């Protein structure tokens, strides 16, 4: 809002001003206004294709985007469960490939999100021809399409004795295979932004806090009610993992400052979080950016 006289104030002339008509009026004062520029974050049309370790975050993303004050976000989801949701399986299934291509062919998808991992990537640990096929098709109908690849947490968390054992393989793969793969894609498609969404890190960090007795919202690691980190033996996301993971999706896709997010609006068991989800999300996002700065 600009400072100054409101429209309800009338300009009244005093008697002295009427009498002293021979006195030249003072020159108007020069007023310098400082207007803070505000970066408007534009909403995106985002298409997520994949399985259940990504779908809940894509489903929750619109409400988080709205809480962050971003308008016009559009979310599309094409879901197939388990291995059928990998980029390779989605491409090899003619029916689902057509479904996804029909959405992309509309030409207005800003961001295509896929999730790890195709069988051929698990074997090679270097490349994924199916991801490249999806990128090629998306760019053929909209050259301005950007891409994000999501790396989830290991399934069957109860099979691991502790968080150290649980996190060892995913951290090793993230460093030795995942980021080199992302970097290779960036070299192949320099005209597009290709991001890594490491929401799997959320599960690792939450389990670490739980095992150290520092996660007051959670009394059992795996439980539907009361909510645990995971809801079942497979390792599907409980509420706290869903909220932290969606913050990571939000921060990756829209590059917002987590401190600006109204975290008090997020509830678990009807209560606000004691755990600093914003700080955890920001740390994970910052570490991904640091890796990008070293390798990109």
Functional labels for PLM-detected ranges:
Residues 14-45:
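N-terminal low-complexity, Pro/Thr/Ser-rich intrinsically disordered segments
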Residues 45-49, 53-137:
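Conserved SGNH/GDSL esterase-like catalytic core that processes O-acyl groups on lipids
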Residues 56, 63-71, 103, 137-141, ...:
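Structured segments of extracytoplasmic/periplasmic soluble domains
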């Amino acid at each position: 809002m600009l400072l100054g006289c409101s429209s309800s104030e009338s300009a009244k002339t005093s008697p002295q001003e009427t009498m002293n008509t021979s006195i030249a009026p003072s020159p108007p004062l020069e007023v310098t206004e400082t207007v803070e520029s505000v970066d408007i974050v534009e909403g995106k049309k985002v298409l997520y294709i994949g399985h259940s370790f990504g779908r809940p975050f894509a489903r929750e993303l619109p409400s988080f985007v709205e809480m962050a004050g971003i308008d016009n976000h559009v979310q599309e989801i094409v879901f197939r469960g388990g291995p059928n949701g990998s980029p390779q399986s989605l491409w090899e299934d003619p029916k689902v490939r057509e479904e996804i291509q029909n959405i992309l062919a509309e030409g207005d998808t800003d961001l295509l999100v896929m999730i790890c991992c195709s069988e051929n990537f698990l074997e090679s640990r270097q490349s994924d021809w199916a991801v490249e096929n999806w990128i090629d098709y998306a760019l053929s109908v909209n050259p301005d399409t950007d891409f994000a690849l999501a790396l989830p947490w290991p399934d069957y968390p109860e099979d691991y004795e502790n968080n150290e054992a649980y996190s060892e393989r995913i951290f090793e793969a993230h460093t030795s295979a995942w980021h080199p793969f992302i970097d290779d894609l960036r070299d192949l498609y320099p005209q597009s932004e290709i991001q890594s969404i490491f929401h799997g890190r959320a599960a690792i960090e939450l389990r670490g806090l739980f095992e150290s007795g520092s996660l007051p919202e959670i009394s059992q690691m795996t439980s539907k009610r009361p909510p645990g980190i995971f809801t079942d033996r497979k390792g599907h996301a409980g509420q706290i993992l869903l909220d932290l993971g969606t913050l990571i999706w939000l921060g990756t896709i829209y590059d917002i400052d987590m401190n600006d997010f109204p975290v008090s609006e997020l509830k678990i068991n009807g209560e606000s979080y004691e755990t600093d989800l914003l700080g955890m999300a920001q740390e994970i996002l910052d570490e991904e950016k640091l890796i990008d700065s070293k390798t990109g």
